Amino acid sequence: MARVVIMDHPLIQHKLSFIRSKNTGSKEFRELVEEVAMLMAYEVTRELPLVETEVETPVAVAKTKVLAGKKLGVVAILRAGLGMINGFVKLIPAAKVGHVGLYRDPKTLEPVEYYCKLPPDVAERDMIVIDPMLATGGSASAALTLLKQKGARHIKLVVLIAAPEGVSRVEQDHPDVDIYAAALDPCLNDHAYIVPGLGDAGDRLFGTK
């Protein structure tokens, strides 16, 4: 069974408070989402393997450690996932970036794919799927399925806010995928919005509905 990790780091929780606030404008919202994404990237990559090496300092030779050549990929679920991309690639500049476009059918609430562009070597990479919200879990589950169809074997899902319904859906459909969230909120409302959540992340990031 997959792990569900709630990141309670003080900086993440502090910034998340301002992200939630309805009084936070698009510019500040974008900046905060990027900052929290970077903090989450730090935690998500905590278990990357290291190898020992040596470097020459101005004084002497030092024994150090570097990443063991593990290939990483980051996939944003459009459009709101775009707000988290920079936070990840600033910390992991060598990561390849993919995009999956999904929209939620207003009647069925199920995802419909309209775009998919992934690194060609996803089977060789540890993939990180990012999206600010895990509500019903439909979009996340569909994106994870797409990655697996392309050969991805090691995947993590990173979201700002999750609802129990979304967590259950991903656990049911993809029990091998660990979920990382900054917060787990109580429930969804009748419109499948996370309560209390933060509203529509895409609208708030880009100032358009």
From Swiss-Prot:
This is Uracil phosphoribosyltransferase. One of its GO terms (molecular function) is magnesium ion binding. It comes from the Bacteria. Binds 1 Mg(2+) ion per subunit. The magnesium is bound as Mg-PRPP. Belongs to the UPRTase family. Keywords: Allosteric enzyme, Glycosyltransferase, GTP-binding, Magnesium, Nucleotide-binding, Transferase. Its cofactor is Mg(2+). It is an enzyme of class 2 (transferase). Coiled coil: none annotated. 5-phospho-alpha-D-ribose 1-diphosphate binds at residues 79, 104, 131-139, 200. Catalyzes the conversion of uracil and 5-phospho-alpha-D-ribose 1-diphosphate (PRPP) to UMP and diphosphate. Pathway: Pyrimidine metabolism; UMP biosynthesis via salvage pathway; UMP from uracil: step 1/1. GO terms for biological process: UMP salvage; uracil salvage. Its EC number is 2.4.2.9. Pfam families: UPRTase. Uracil binds at residues 194, 199-201. It catalyses: UMP + diphosphate = 5-phospho-alpha-D-ribose 1-diphosphate + uracil. InterPro entries: PRibTrfase_dom (IPR000836), PRTase-like (IPR029057), Upp_B (IPR034332), UPRTase/APRTase (IPR050054), Ura_phspho_trans (IPR005765). PANTHER family: ADENINE PHOSPHORIBOSYLTRANSFERASE, URACIL PHOSPHORIBOSYLTRANSFERASE, CHLOROPLASTIC. Allosterically activated by GTP.
